[in-house]
Structure formats: structure tokens, C-alpha cells
Amino acid sequence: VVPTMLRAGNTTNTVPDLAVLDIDIRSYSMDDLKRVDSAIKNLKAVNADARYEITGGFNRPPLETSSTMALYERAAKVAKELGMPPLGHASVGGASDGNFAAAAGAQVLDGLGAIGGGAHAAHEWVDISTLEIQSALLNALIKDLLND
């Protein structure tokens, strides 16, 4: 749960008549996402005179590990055949378009692209020396899947 945007007022010496807070919520499971969404929607004001409105809700399902394991194991086999080190895996609670595909029952792998760090930040970077092997892995995985 990360408060990512806050907008209020237009001068430093005036109490704003409106404040808007946007919150980014990511989760490893739909149950956790629903629990946090419910907790936020049931928040009560500390000041009885305060007026507030809570709108919105989650805009994508989580990418649950159970929906990715079979395809991950296949990618790990292909990586081993290419002589790559063992593929890592992580549940990150991220938000990609793959979340929708996985929720619809498709097998999804996320994170097969460039290797780097600082995702979505000003200091984001890509290790270009990894692009060739990552491309080879993706190419070999697609060929393996097409051979079924």
C-alpha cells in the first residue's frame, strides 16, 4: 500500500478546501487485495467534522504464482538447455497487463525482458550485456511452445 499522489490547495498559507490522495495497492493474492480494499473503504475520520469520500478500488487482479508455475517450469527447462544459470522466480505483487490474462486462465510469465533495476523510477537502468541471452531464451521458449 503506497500513497503515490497527493493534490491539495494552491498556496502554502491557505487551508485547502479539497485534498485528493491516490493509493497504489499491490497484492500477491485476490484475498489479500480484497481485504486491503475493504479496510480502506471502511476507514473512519478522526475528526468528526471532516468530510471525505472514498472512491475507486482495485483496477487489476494480482498475478498469482499458481497461474504461472507450469510455464515457469518449461522456461526453466529451456534455460537449462541453453546453458543458462537457473532461472530465478519471485512473487512481486506487480501490476502488468499479464495479470488480466492470468486471471482469465492463461499461463503467464512476466519478467522475461531486459535485466536491470530501479523499475519505473528516474534511476531505472538496463544491463545491455544481458539482452542477447534474454532474447535467446525467449526465442527458444517460443520455439519449444510451438513444437507442442
Tell what function each PLM region has.
Residues 1-148:
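Metal-dependent amide/peptide-bond hydrolase catalytic core
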